[in-house]
Amino acid sequence: MGLGRVLLFLAVAFPFAPPAAAAEPHSLRYNLMVLSQDGSVQSGFLAEGHLDGQPFLRYDRQKRRAKPQGQWAENVLGAKTWDTETEDLTENGQDLRRTLTHIKDQKGGLHSLQEIRVCEIHEDSSTRGSRHFYYDGELFLSQNLETQESTVPQSSRAQTLAMNVTNFWKEDAMKTKTHYRAMQADCLQKLQRYLKSGVAIRRTVPPMVNVTCSEVSEGNITVTCRASSFYPRNITLTWRQDGVSLSHNTQQWGDVLPDGNGTYQTWVATRIRQGEEQRFTCYMEHSGNHGTHPVPSGKALVLQSQRTDFPYVSAAMPCFVIIIILCVPCCKKKTSAAEGPELVSLQVLDQHPVGTGDHRDAAQLGFQPLMSATGSTGSTEGT
C-alpha cells in the first residue's frame, strides 16, 4: 500500500465536515473491511462497532467472534448480545467479500473494500439509516436504506465501481427493497435495545479553551483559539471584534479531531493589528454552555509569541500517528506474504461521525456527490 493509498485512508479518516449546531442523534455504526491480494479475496474480515460515537465492539479475527470494546460495554451487555453480533457480522462480512469478488477493475497488489453502516435516532424520534462503500479508501457509493436512493461521487472511477456493484446486487434476488428496510430496522432495534440497557448514557465534557498569539510581519498578530478535551463533538468556535463575529473569510478553522481519549479538539485563528488585542474575543458555545475568551496582551503576549504553539502542529500529530498505523501493517505484508496480508485497523476511521442518508451526507464525508456543488469548508463555526 503506497503513499497514495495512505492519503486516501486519511481522507476517509478526516472528513472535512463542519459540525451542526443541533444536538447529536443517538447512533449505531458498524465498520467492516475485506481485502484482496492479486485478485484473490482474502478470508476473514475486520469489523468494529461504535455506539453514540464510542467504541463498544470489535470483531476478533482469530476467534471469529464479536467481543466487547471497553469495560462499560462488557459490564452492561450480556453474552447473548455478542452471539447476535457475531452472527450478524459474519453474514455481513461474507456479503462484503462476495461484493469485492465482483469488482472487475481489480489489478495486482492489495485492494480493500470497506462498508460503513449507520443508523440514527433523532431528538424528534425520526430515524435514518445508510451505507457507505469505499474501494481502496475512496468513497464510491452511498445508499439511503429507507429510500434506496444512491449517491455517487463525480469521478469516473467511482461511477464505474458503483455501476459494477449495483448491477451485481440486482442479480441477487435477496437484495430487494424489503431487504434494505429490514437491514435498517434491525440496526434501529439494536440501537434502541442498547439505549434501554443504559450502555449509551449521554455525557458532556466541557472544552478547555486556550488563546495564544504569535507575532507576524508589519505589526500584525495571529491569534489562535484552541478548544480541547470536549464531548460531544458539536461546537461553535469563532472570533469576535467588539462583540460582533468576524466574517467567514477572515478566519481559518481547523477540523474537529479526536484527542485520543474519547474527546475532541479544534481551533480557529485570525490576524489582528498589534495593540488592538482588547477588542477581540474568542466565542465558544458547546452543549448549551457558552463563554468568551480575551486575547492576552502585554507580557502575556510576548510569552505566548515565544512559544511555537500553533494549531497546525496539533492537527498534524494525529495524521502522523495514522500513517504509522497504516504503514506498519503494509510493511508486514511485504515480509510475510505467505501468511497473507493483515487487515488494516479501522479504529482511526471510527473516531469520526459519518452522516446517514442524502447528498448532504456524502459531502460531509469529504467527497462530492453527483450533481452537487462544493459544500463543506472545514469550519467549526455554528450553522
UniProtKB/Swiss-Prot annotation:
Topology in membrane: Single-pass type I membrane protein
GO molecular function: natural killer cell lectin-like receptor binding
Main location: membrane
Residue positions the entry lists as glycosylated: N164, N210, N220, N261
Domain Ig-like C1-type: 207-298
Phenotypic consequence of A300V: In allele MICB*001, allele MICB*016, allele MICB*018, allele MICB*019, allele MICB*020 and allele MICB*022
Sequence ranges on the Extracellular membrane side: 23-309
tRNA-binding as UniProt keyword: no
Outcome of substituting R279K: In allele MICB*007
Stretch forming the signal peptide: 1-22
Oligomer status and interactors: Unlike classical MHC class I molecules, does not form a heterodimer with beta-2-microglobulin. Binds as a monomer to a KLRK1/NKG2D homodimer. KLRK1 forms a complex with HCST/DAP10 in which KLRK1 binds MICB while HCST acts as an adapter molecule which enables signal transduction. Receptor-ligand interaction induces clustering of both proteins in ordered structures called immune synapses and also leads to their intercellular transfer. This is associated with a reduction in the cytotoxicity of KLRK1-expressing cells.
Associated clinical condition: Rheumatoid arthritis: An inflammatory disease with autoimmune features and a complex genetic component. It primarily affects the joints and is characterized by inflammatory changes in the synovial membranes and articular structures, widespread fibrinoid degeneration of the collagen fibers in mesenchymal tissues, and by atrophy and rarefaction of bony structures. Genetic variation in MICB is associated with cytomegalovirus and herpes simplex virus I seropositivity and this may be associated with schizophrenia risk.
Functional note: Widely expressed membrane-bound protein which acts as a ligand to stimulate an activating receptor KLRK1/NKG2D, expressed on the surface of essentially all human natural killer (NK), gammadelta T and CD8+ alphabeta T-cells. Up-regulated in stressed conditions, such as viral and bacterial infections or DNA damage response, serves as signal of cellular stress, and engagement of KLRK1/NKG2D by MICA triggers NK-cells resulting in a range of immune effector functions, such as cytotoxicity and cytokine production.
Name of the protein this chain belongs to: MHC class I polypeptide-related sequence B
Phylogenetic placement of the source organism: Eukaryota, Metazoa, Chordata, Craniata, Vertebrata
Gene: MICB
